Amino acid sequence: MLKRCILAENRKLHASPIWAMFFVLPILSATYGTFNYLQNLEILTDGWYSLWTQHTLFYSMLFFPAMVATYAAYLWRLEHLGHNWNLIMASPVPPLDLFAAKFAVVIKLALLTHGFVFALFVFCGKVFAHMPGLPPVTLPLFLLRGLLGALAVIAAQLVLAMVIRSFAVPIFLGLLGGITGIFISYKGHGLLWPYSLMQLGMNSNRSADALAGSYGLFAASCLGWLVVFFLLAHLLLRRCDVRA
């Protein structure tokens, strides 16, 4: 049943307007990051690493939470129309399978987004910043860490989009979560807030490794928040029928 749900969710992406956002926002982020790097060459002297900090700063803080929030809101949009929610609750599909299917599809979109962001990073580094060689192998590692941290953001936004009928409100809350994550990370408590995990994983706006000596805690926090949001989704779907 889960496989069928995933196939059904994937069909929603065919000719979807979210693909325009998929391309536009990473390009905007890369443009801003490259411009900021080129304007501060006297300060940003660490080559590929310095360019990475500029590319990932606003991507991890604003653009990615907004994109994930939009993905999640779009996938729940059909269920919130008319009486579709009642039909879903009366169907033989386990409600948590529906949530898990949307989670899998947003992960796929996040993976594609991360890949596109990294391709833009390499392109801008070679073409505009004239970087020598290829990016250090640690930068793709940061990208993978960011994807692990993004799982909590994805689950959080799916829960918000599930319980809030408005399309715009979950997106605003995603942006707010990302901005809040910056301040919480600055205070040294980033592992305690789900929206900080992706920023820490990406090592955004930092020259030193933000997770040095904390990989275990980072993985535990990512898993813990993921479990929390899945349990919350299960309880809401089971007890409240999430009336929108």
Each language-model region and where it sits:
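Cytoplasmic juxtamembrane interface segments
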Residues: M1-L7, W76-M89, L147-P170
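Secretory targeting signals
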Residues: P26-V68, A100-I164, N205, G213-A219
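Helix-loop-helix units of permease transmembrane domains in multi-pass membrane transporters
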Residues: L75-I107
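Aromatic- and glycine-rich beta-strand/loop motifs that create alpha-glucan
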Residues: M1-P26
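Membrane-helix interface segments
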Residues: P17-I18, G82, P94-L96, A100, ...
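Terminal transmembrane helical anchor/hairpin motif
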Residues: F35-W52, I171-A244
